[in-house]
Amino acid sequence: MTTGLSLDEGKVIEGRPKALRDKVLIVFSNKVFNREEILFEVFGVEDNAGKQVHRGVDWTTKYYTVTIDVYVDSFSNLEDWTNEFCDPDFDELRDVIAGWIIVLPFSGNIEEETKALSRLVNNATSEDFFTAILATELNVGKNERAFLEYNVLAGAVELVHNELDSDGELKEVNGVDRVKEIIDTCDWHPRLLRTAHLESETGMESACTGISLAQIMGSLREARTKYMAMDPGLDREEFANEMANELSKLL
C-alpha cells in the first residue's frame, strides 16, 4: 500500500496508486466508562494501556475474512476533536479509513454533537465509507430524538443504541451487534478479501506496531508543514515522494 502526500489543495501526487481502505477508527467519548468492554466485544482486542493502534486484526464473516487495523481514539469535546481530525493535514489518514464508529452518550442539548457528526460525514472520502454512532445513552426528549435521527439519516449515518429488552439483554440488532453487522456489510476492496475458497498468506507485520495514532497525526502535520515551506521544484516533489513512502509505513 502506498499513500500519496497531500499537496497544496489536498490532491494526491499524480500517478501514485490509491491507498486501500483497511483501517477502522473507533472513537470514544471520555464519558464512556466501558470502552474496554465495547472494544473487545466489537474487535476482540484488549485496550491495553490506552493502545491506539491494533494491527493485523482479522474480521471474519461466513463469506470472507479481511485483515484490518483498528485505530482507537478518545475525546472530551466532540467538536474540538472533529475540527482537528477534519484538518487537511490528515487527508492521508482519512483516505485509508474504511469507516468510523463514534461511541458517546446523548443527553440534554444534542445540537452541538449533531453538527460535529454532520461535519465528520461530510469529510468521508468515499461513497462506500461507513459511519456508525453507538449511543451508550439516549436520554433526550422525543423532539430532540427526532431531531437527532432526522439529521443522522440525512447524513447517511447509522444510529445504534445500546437498548435493553425486558430480560436485560441487548436486542439482537441493537448496540454492539448492529455495529458488527455494519462492518460485515462494508464494501471492502477485493484485494483485501480472503474467502473460504482461497488460501491466504499471513500479511507482513508492520515495523511500526508501537506507533500511536497521535504520532501518526503528528508526522502527517510535520510533513505537510515542511512541504508547504519548500520552494516549488524538483526537490519539493522528491521530498513529497520520500515522505509518502515513509508515511505509508505508518498508516
Swiss-Prot record:
Record family assignment: Belongs to the IRC6 family.
Cysteine-cysteine disulfides: none
Name recorded for this polypeptide: Increased recombination centers protein 6
Keywords: Chromosomal rearrangement
Role summary: Involved in gross chromosomal rearrangements (GCRs) and telomere healing.
GO BP term, pick one: vesicle-mediated transport
UniProt-recorded Gene Ontology molecular function terms: protein-macromolecule adaptor activity
